[in-house]
Amino acid sequence: CCTCMSLAVVHIVPMLSDRGFSPEIAAGALATLMLVGVLGRMGAGKICDLIGPVRTYALMSAGQTVLVIWFPHIESLFGVYLLAALFGFSFSGVMASMVISVNVVVPPRVAARAWSIVSFFAWIGMGTGSYMGGFLFDLTGGYHWAYAFAAAMGCINLVILTLFYFSRGRQQPVLVVS
């Protein structure tokens, strides 16, 4: 999930600037993405309460995966801001629901180890997405393949989440009390 989100977040301003949008518009799209992200975190928390954290994580991951592929194709100013807002909600929802998912599915006795592993792979994913966006841009001269790569990484994440979900069987959600 982190590869998908980081590529979009890091490359939205240069991509929009390269496509002829003013720097103010490009920065405004990033600001919109981040500000709506605040609502995404709160929204994901509420959705976790309703359908469970792993399902919410999958839903938000699916949202960011479907939305990320559209960034290089949107031409209108309204479309850019709408896509930035929807993606911001989804990507922040991924982050919030992933935290809750780990806390719910991991036994407390191994929580520190689990969080170390999750954090390690999250940071690797963040770096990979940012780097690959630039690498693919340099290789192809455009952002279409970079954002397609982000969507492919989102699909891999969804496959992993689906396998994890079905491998757990029908378990009842566990309340985590701090």
Regions found by a protein language model. Name each.
Residues 1-44, 129:
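Extracytoplasmic gate region of multi-pass secondary transporters
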Residues 40-52, 137-138:
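Helix-to-loop junctions at the C-terminal end of transmembrane segments
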Residues 63-75:
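C-terminal ends and interior cores of transmembrane alpha-helices
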Residues 67, 78-86:
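Paired small-residue
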Residues 93-106:
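Intracellular juxtamembrane helix-capping segments at the cytosolic ends
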Residues 105-142, 150:
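A late C-terminal transmembrane helix in Major Facilitator Superfamily
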Residues 145-164:
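Symmetry-related core transmembrane helices of the 12-TM Major Facilitator Superfamily/SLC fold
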